[in-house]
Structure formats: structure tokens, C-alpha cells
Amino acid sequence: MAYRKLGRTSSQRKAMLRDLTTDLLINESIVTTEARAKEIRKTVEKMITLGKRGDLHARRQAAAFVRNEIASENYDEATDKYTSTSALQKLFNEIAPRYAERNGGYTRILKTEPRRGDAAPMAIIELV
């Protein structure tokens, strides 16, 4: 089998992977279980590769997977308005150019101590 089931149905698993991938793109580092970290590594690598391509088709493919969440919000005093950046905009405008010269290997998984409640192996996954 080429993927982990993670104890969920396929729709639940896909939703969880979309959420974790979006969170990683926004925060650039998250703490999760080791199995989930290894699984979202695949999707994050694909999204960054799409971001590096940068064409319209790649943008639409990434938009179909990444959640429409606000990555950052800034206040402009001159115009008295808030400007927000979505996770998709951050992927294409900030993250992808950072890895323009890198061929894969955009994430790093660091193992940490087990979770206190159930001793599940935990890991920190972050963008390199």
C-alpha cells in the first residue's frame, strides 16, 4: 500500500491532510504525530513543486487542494485598510521562490518525545 490509512475513512483522511498541509504552509512548522508528518510531507512537496511551476494550471491544481485560509493580515495606516494574504498566495509568492534552486526535499521531520496522553510518537515537521 502506498499510503497510510491513519484510522480514518478516505474522505476524513483527505480532509485531515488538506488541513495539515494548509497549516504547514501558513505556519511553516507544526507539531503532529510521526505518521501524519510522514504522510503530509508528500502533499507539501507536491504543493511547493506546483508553486515553483507557477503557471495557471499549477495554481488551479494547488487551489483545489489547499484550504482558503488567511495566512497573514496587515494594517495599512495610509489607506486605513486591512490587507490579507491567503495560504495559496503565500505558497506562490513567498514559499515557492525560496526553493527555486532546490530540487525536492523542502521539509524536515524532527522526532520529539511521545505525547503524554497515549505515548503516540510525535514529530515536528517544518519547511527547510
Swiss-Prot record:
Keywords: Ribonucleoprotein, Ribosomal protein. One of its GO terms (biological process) is translation. GO terms for molecular function: structural constituent of ribosome. Disulfide bonds: none annotated. The keyword rRNA processing does not apply. Pfam families: Ribosomal_L17. Part of the 50S ribosomal subunit. Contacts protein L32. Belongs to the bacterial ribosomal protein bL17 family. This is Large ribosomal subunit protein bL17. The gene is rplQ.
